[in-house]
């Protein structure tokens, strides 16, 4: 194997929240047709990649709760991009510093997969273009493509059809999650499908109308003031009804001073509240941190960021 120009790199792998999650219908391929607005936040994992000379992918992490086997999306992504390179001699030692909670609805695993594609493309001097990386990312999961560019985007289809949302949002965010709770995304979508299937739209015309309505309305008419704003998550009705911890988190967030809106992210169980800016969010966070902990929640304060995966 010829000597590679890069021996070690670090990649920032941020979380996301859903500002809008609407289930339109069921696709022929079994996935759900979605209309979403996804937004990156600065709660991030960090992944170090270092070349090795044994042609193997080795993964370690500071997290004791994370599987480091072949089912880990980092390993899957590394094998995908290695197979594409057709170079069996390529190898990497990977260390994941895990800060994003696992199974939380913040897409930490999807973000890590995207970070692996971007990181190894650089480390191994593969020079794969954006389109190729994007196609690879879509094979790994519905949320993975979003993180390649990130920021704030409309996400349609099963999540792989992306349109940049040129927003000027500067919200501060407080996150709450019960550390003892994780929720199956597959099961949650299945339960939603069973209950609301008669309401599904399958016609292209109606699907396009919902997409266009979201493009036109979104948060464009929102003026930063004391008013509440609408954040939508169709899965919340299922999870909140079956999970007292999520119901409690939403109640606590709804009663925070200066809260503009609150919702569940993805399929949960993490819930979030939006504030006018990070300074207000920090102040509210400091005032209520003990209360969050006393009620059994881990809590974070974050700001929105305009990028996804970042090479450091």
From Swiss-Prot:
Entry EC no(s): 2.7.1.148
Positions annotated to bind ATP: 101-111
One GO BP annotation of this record: terpenoid biosynthetic process
Broad enzyme group: transferase
Pathway assigned in UniProt: Isoprenoid biosynthesis; isopentenyl diphosphate biosynthesis via DXP pathway; isopentenyl diphosphate from 1-deoxy-D-xylulose 5-phosphate: step 3/6
InterPro entries: GHMP_kinase_C_dom, GHMP_kinase_C_sf, GHMP_kinase_N_dom, IspE, Ribosomal_Su5_D2-typ_SF, Ribsml_uS5_D2-typ_fold_subgr
Function: Catalyzes the phosphorylation of the position 2 hydroxy group of 4-diphosphocytidyl-2C-methyl-D-erythritol.
PANTHER family, alphabetized: 4-DIPHOSPHOCYTIDYL-2-C-METHYL-D-ERYTHRITOL KINASE, CHLOROPLASTIC
The protein, known as: 4-diphosphocytidyl-2-C-methyl-D-erythritol kinase
Gene label: ispE
Alphabetical keyword list: ATP-binding, Isoprene biosynthesis, Kinase, Nucleotide-binding, Transferase
Keyword Chloroplast: no
GO MF annotation terms: 4-(cytidine 5'-diphospho)-2-C-methyl-D-erythritol kinase activity; ATP binding
Pfam families: GHMP_kinases_C, GHMP_kinases_N
Organism of provenance: Prochlorococcus marinus subsp. pastoris (strain CCMP1986 / NIES-2087 / MED4)
Active site: 16, 143
Catalyzed reaction equations: 4-CDP-2-C-methyl-D-erythritol + ATP = 4-CDP-2-C-methyl-D-erythritol 2-phosphate + ADP + H(+)
rRNA processing listed as a keyword: no
Family as reported in the entry's similarity comment: Belongs to the GHMP kinase family. IspE subfamily.
